[in-house]
UniProtKB/Swiss-Prot annotation:
Name this protein carries in UniProt: Vitamin B12 import ATP-binding protein BtuD
Domain ABC transporter: 2-237
Subcellular location: Cell inner membrane
Catalytic activity: an R-cob(III)alamin(out) + ATP + H2O = an R-cob(III)alamin(in) + ADP + phosphate + H(+)
Name of the gene encoding the protein in the UniProt record: btuD
The protein's enzyme class: translocase
Chain's role: Part of the ABC transporter complex BtuCDF involved in vitamin B12 import. Responsible for energy coupling to the transport system.
Length: 252
């Protein structure tokens, strides 16, 4: 259980409270500048200037060293490609938990499963500098998953993803959501910033709706993704339709 109580970051994020349960997928939604990245950075433990309490199974986040943090959570921020050059498999090796409990056979099994799910098995010996934006993002995602994969790291509790689908095409995005579902099935809590509200409608167990640093509402996707509520926050027309018993949101 991850508990966030009265968390704030100056004027960028006003006090909010919520919980993240193991195996639960939480989407943070809202317009650009609403505080999504600020919230995720604070929860990751690397952000400065936050006030309030963030507890991982009762342990205060501020009391953890960076090494301990890396065992409990993985954080995929919005980031440019690194200046140094490595092959993909070397980069992924650096992503393994600092005190990996896995044997070589377990590491290889985890790498094989994650690489296949993200369709990067044929890229392990490529230079990271030669990858496209979508390929590089999938490699970064693989690294984050290796860091918190339960067979390699029994201390892992949380995966934090800041707009992970942004560089991905439609097919790659589908791979991403299957991977997130797999991570959640392993008992890891997942929290992610997301702009595709139809994906949120289908894949989120919990939704946090932010506007100008304020948590407007939270709850299930069905409770939060109400057209009237979304119109007020996003300042655009929203319509809900049903096709083959599946609900979709239309905008504009």
């Amino acid at each position: 259980m991850i508990q966030i109580k009265s968390l704030s970051v100056g004027a960028r994020l006003l006090p909010l409270s919520f919980e993240l349960k193991q195996g639960q997928v939480t989407h943070v939604i809202g317009p650009n500048g609403s505080g999504k990245s600020t919230l995720l950075e604070a929860i990751s433990g690397v952000g400065d200037g936050y006030k309030g309490d963030i507890k991982l199974d009762g342990q205060d986040l501020s009391e953890l060293s960076l090494q301990d943090l890396s065992l409990h959570r993985a954080y995929l921020c919005q980031s440019a490609r690194p200046a140094f050059n490595l092959e993909v498999f070397q980069y992924l090796a650096l992503s393994l938990p600092s005190s990996s409990h896995g044997l070589d056979i377990e590491i290889n099994a985890a790498l094989d499963e994650i690489s296949q799910m993200l369709d990067i098995s044929d890229k392990l010996h490529r230079s990271i500098q030669t990858l496209s934006g979508g390929e590089w993002q999938r490699v970064r995602l693989a690294g984050m998953c290796l860091q918190i994969w339960p067979t390699l790291n029994p201390y892992a509790k949380l995966l934090i993803l800041d707009e992970p689908a942004a560089p991905l095409d439609i097919a790659q995005e589908a791979l991403l959501y299957k991977l997130i579902e797999r991570v959640a099935e392993k008992g890891i809590a997942v929290i992610m910033a997301n702009h595709d509200l139809n994906r949120t409608l289908r894949h989120a167990d919990q939704v946090l709706l932010l506007e100008k640093g304020v948590l407007q509402t939270s709850g299930s996707a069905e409770q939060v993704l109400v057209p009237e509520q979304l119109e007020s926050v996003f300042n655009t027309q929203v319509k809900s339709i049903s096709v083959d018993n599946q609900t979709y949101l239309l905008f504009g």
